[in-house]
Amino acid sequence: MLDRLQAVENRYEKLNELLSDPEVISDTNKLREYSKEQSDIQDTVEVYREYKDVREQLRDAKAMLEDKLDADMRDMVKEEVSELEGQEKTLSERLKILLVPKDPNDDKNVIVEVRGAAGGDEAALFAGDLYRMYSRYAEVQGWKTEIIEASYTELGGYKEIIFMINGKGAFAKLKFENGAHRVQRVPETESGGRIHTSTATVAVLPEAEEVEINIHEKDVRVDTFASSGPGGQSVNTTMSAVRLTHLPTGVVVSCQDEKSQIKNKEKAMKVLRARVYDKFRQEAQAEYDQNRKQAVGTGDRSERIRTYNFPQNRVTDHRIGLTIQKLDQILQGKLDDFINALVMEDQAQKMEAAE
């Protein structure tokens, strides 16, 4: 571990030199790249330097115990040794976590896609519950939510809703929401009072910047059409809705939320870039993980990850076996218990894999 930490510190010092180089300063892309790399390892370097300082103090204190000391001084030094050993252990544990490979997408904004799946109208209503849950969670975090595209049902649910959450660290916290969410409840339209089971799927994509994935205009087919509202009726006579097709991958994105065709195209392009980037990211991850099954999935959207049981006010995350008896609060956006547990489980697995 110490060799790895020393290599990180050496790289940090090298980056300091590079960021002072006029050639780098004049190159916007290199400056951004090196600044981000330095920022990513800064905490590790600071804790490592503190760790080295504590170890040096500990060596000096232990060396003092080899000298002839009176009883009071020996007790003082022993107390100092005990305190320094505690600090050394704490810093060592922090360094183990800091050395866990960081997902380069963690700090990014996210595009979230929620779709009603099995269960018809009830699944669409549940998709609306999930959208509001994530919106409220984002609000608590101080993040901004913006709807990109929504396909409504007559009962007020969503066949599909795509929205962006802007905020640092959004992907780090929300990436574990990928998958199938199951709901068990008595539908409002059910006169017999029977519990129905429905599902909605959630996809969380990191926003892709133009420098990360270059989509050429010639590779995108643009189709325009009239926007439609609930039930499919036309809501305007202008061709403001936009459909983009990325020809090399077959990825298709539509947007009709704005009255302006230009704004719809801009929003659709954000989603298209994120989906194409995510497709390549998933393929690379699948190849890397083909012989290793991760317990905390962040990619398989067919995986049933969570059940929301309304009669028992209970939510269960099946990946980590965590059940919480406060469904009402969770749907109000109080997701920290689940998100923190999933992040900790992911870190523990990565630490184990790194050993």
UniProtKB/Swiss-Prot annotation:
* Primary residence: cytoplasm
How is this chain modified after translation? Methylated by PrmC. Methylation increases the termination efficiency of RF1.
A molecular function annotated in GO for this UniProt entry is: translation release factor activity, codon specific
Query: What SUPFAM superfamilies does the annotation carry?
Result: Release factor
Q: Which InterPro entries match?
A: PCRF, Pep_chain_release_fac_I, Pep_chain_release_fac_I_sf, Prokaryotic/Mito_RF, RF-1
- Superkingdom is Bacteria
User: In the record, which positions carry N5-methylglutamine?
Assistant: 233
GO CC term (a single one): cytoplasm
Which is an annotated Pfam family here?
A: PCRF
Assigned keywords, A-Z: Cytoplasm, Methylation, Protein biosynthesis
**Signal peptide residues on this chain, from the entry's feature table:** none
| Cellular localisation | Cytoplasm
Cross-referenced HAMAP family? Rel_fac_1
According to its UniProt record, which protein family does this protein belong to? Belongs to the prokaryotic/mitochondrial release factor family.
What does the function comment of this entry state? Peptide chain release factor 1 directs the termination of translation in response to the peptide chain termination codons UAG and UAA.
Q: What is this protein called?
A: Peptide chain release factor 1
Taxonomic lineage of the native organism: Bacteria, Bacillati, Bacillota, Bacilli, Bacillales
